[in-house]
Amino acid sequence: GTRYNDMGFRVGFQFTGEHSVDLNASVQLDMLWVEPGTFTMGSPTTEADRQADREDEHNVTLTKGFYLGKYEVTQAQYEAVMTGNTDSLSATPSEWPNNPNRPVEKVSWVDAQIFLTRLNAQQSANIPAGWAYVLPTESQWEYACRAGTTTMYSWGNDINATRANYNVSGLSQTRDVGYYAANPLGFFDMHGNV
């Protein structure tokens, strides 16, 4: 398949309770619990700048809660898990390297799956049998991103450089995770960065 090396990602975890992972002596992965619930997924056909291929609004019920990374996976987290991998993948693939608190980017979906396989192996003694670190489903991600709101963004219907790092904010590169305010559920950078 085609490799797209320009994505970032978050880690999900199928388990209840508080969860924080020590990846090494100085790197931690913080995750927040999201309660199950029902929300409206998709966007209204009247939404400004809506892409034609976007899903129309429809109700989705998540019957199980889940964990999601409080931040995008950082360069330091990615390096802590991927150092020594045997898949010929760089442990430091970033366009803007040596920024440990910026999100990792220039990774493909396959790279993210290898990261998760390695994370699960490294943390196998610390997680219950049958549970695993995974990429969130589209429904889980949108539910956490919307955070109970019905607007285009979790803070309203407008976006600007004080709220998110995005293609016209003028920065032309990533920022440290958590630079902008969190959404109502406590997740950072759900709109923008990578």
Locations of regions flagged by a protein language model:
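Non-transmembrane alpha-helical segments in soluble domains
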Residues: 12, 70, 75-82, 113-120, ...
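Short Gly/Pro-enriched turn/cap motifs at secondary-structure boundaries
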Residues: 1-3, 22, 57-58, 177-179
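A general structural signal marking secondary-structure boundaries and capping sites
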Residues: 15, 85-86, 123, 148
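Short, flexible turn/loop "capping" segments at secondary-structure junctions
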Residues: 58-61, 96, 169-170
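A short glycine-rich, aromatic-capped structural motif
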Residues: 8, 23-88, 107-110, 191-192
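Functional-site microenvironments in short loops/helix caps that host divalent-cation chemistry
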Residues: 1, 40, 44-46, 98, ...
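Surface-exposed intrinsically disordered loops and tails
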Residues: 91-94
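Disulfide-stabilized, aromatic/cysteine-rich ligand-recognition loop
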Residues: 1-19, 182-183
